[in-house]
Amino acid sequence: MAAKDIRFGEDARTRMVRGVNVLANAVKATLGPKGRNVVLEKSFGAPTITKDGVSVAKEIELADKFENMGAQMVKEVASKTNDNAGDGTTTATVLAQALIREGAKAVAAGMNPMDLKRGIDQAVKAAVVELKNISKPTTDDKAIAQVGTISANSDESIGNIIAEAMQKVGKEGVITVEEGSGLENELDVVEGMQFDRGYLSPYFINNQQSQSADLDDPFILLHDKKISNVRDLLPVLEGVAKAGKPLLIVAEEVEGEALATLVVNTIRGIVKVVAVKAPGFGDRRKAMLEDMAVLTGGTVISEEVGLALEKATIKDLGRAKKVQVSKENTTIIDGAGDTAAIESRVGQIKTQIEDTSSDYDREKLQERVAKLAGGVAVIKVGASTEIEMKEKKARVEDALHATRAAVEEGVVPGGGVALVRALVAVGELKGANEDQTHGIQIALRAMEAPLREIVANAGEEPSVILNKVKEGSGNYGYNAANGEFGDMVQFGILDPTKVTRSALQNAASIAGLMITTEAMVADAPKKDEPVMPAGGGMGGMGGMDF
């Protein structure tokens, strides 16, 4: 086992704080509307330019192992906040730095680290309650657009396109971000349920222009096994032909005689049919077929529940207003399912989302919720260069996470004002002893740090602006973009409550651990072995030329 280098007490904390400051100073330069960019070197290709706090934090590794431990712990604050709320990484880093710096000073002055931590925790708990009291729910598209705009570094076009996407696919809808091919941002919306399976035969195409099979007001047959014998399908086909409606068949596979008969019927115009494979595999396929059944008001024809295909009738089929089938995708629009049944199914899937530990499963379950609840929107990010594209895409993703957080827990006035307003509730607290009370004071000073940093990045004097904001009440704050004081909500400067809350809680969590650290252990640096001297020539080799 390699030898270890161990540091204790003040020496350990000083090095750790030095590492925290290096990382936090690089990250906090990006905070606020007048925050600066940070350029990140890449091992290949052009450097990346970003104003995203977590992207900067992830790139930082320090040479000194003890300083690096401090930096890595603050990096954890940024990452955790990003995972929880999708934004607020820079705010979390600024809060953590302020708490750690003041906490380390107090420990150096002889205060009890555990009492300091208890005081900080007490203050954070009170601040979180106050943030929830200040919070207002987001009910309109305008508020959603404003949250997106602020998170995307005051880019209104991003805020507006996210609000439009949410309006079209609903709050539960899936919104994905892709790299576009043009200069402008574009929004593509797929309404209804879409899955990645196309028609099984090109003979089903009835719209030559779009090379797709379009069915109006069709019946939908859902089956979890292969269909190869046409006799099994006859009762359903006869019922559909009598009703004079088209039919969509979704099954594990349609092949052989069955597929040939369906194609012939379609070409002759006897029954308009399109057959597609069911999406997914195994249990996920069964679940998706069940989703389709709920959406269309039909039943999955499955022998597992005692339903044989040859016994199926027209009553077992689902309905939809329209179905579009292309070579790769099938879209079911406006299914005839019962709204209460759909909501119940969505609730069931949401419970599974909470219970699952796999990110992949969670993503797939969220997609299923979106397909049932409204649809899928794709934001295609436009830019003139690849470097700009990457930077812009990261901002759009941040803004999207922030708007989701805003919908979830509401919004508070932005620009660091919400934390300043929460100071009143925290200021009333008293600790069980002097050291705990000092811990509360540390949290009070730290909660001012985000506003101070926003003002400093805008080139103004932080203390002057902070005092003026403190003199006001409610939403009164400072707009660093144009130097005006006023109502932050009217200015459109809003932060999601979840983002501010997560930033404060995660910063306090790591700061508490670092303040109470008494020893640090790292691998001792390896000493370079002396180089072997060059060997002498062998005897009897004199006079040879090399």
From Swiss-Prot:
Any one of the GO BP annotations: protein refolding
Its EC number(s): 5.6.1.7
GO molecular function, one term: isomerase activity
Keyword check for ATP-binding: yes
Keyword Chaperone: yes
EC top class, as a word: isomerase
Any one Gene Ontology cellular component term annotated for this protein: cytoplasm
Main location: cytoplasm
Reactions catalysed according to its record: ATP + H2O + a folded polypeptide = ADP + phosphate + an unfolded polypeptide
InterPro entries: Chaperonin_Cpn60_CS, Cpn60/GroEL, Cpn60/GroEL/TCP-1, GroEL-like_apical_dom_sf, GROEL-like_equatorial_sf, TCP-1-like_intermed_sf
Assembly with partners or alone: Forms a cylinder of 14 subunits composed of two heptameric rings stacked back-to-back. Interacts with the co-chaperonin GroES.
PANTHER family the UniProt entry points to: 60 KDA HEAT SHOCK PROTEIN, MITOCHONDRIAL
NCBIfam families: GroEL, PRK00013.1, PRK12849.1, PRK12850.1, PRK12851.1
Function (record text): Together with its co-chaperonin GroES, plays an essential role in assisting protein folding. The GroEL-GroES system forms a nano-cage that allows encapsulation of the non-native substrate proteins and provides a physical environment optimized to promote and accelerate protein folding.
Family: Belongs to the chaperonin (HSP60) family.
Name of the protein: Chaperonin GroEL
Source organism of this protein record: Xanthomonas campestris pv. phaseoli
Gene: groEL
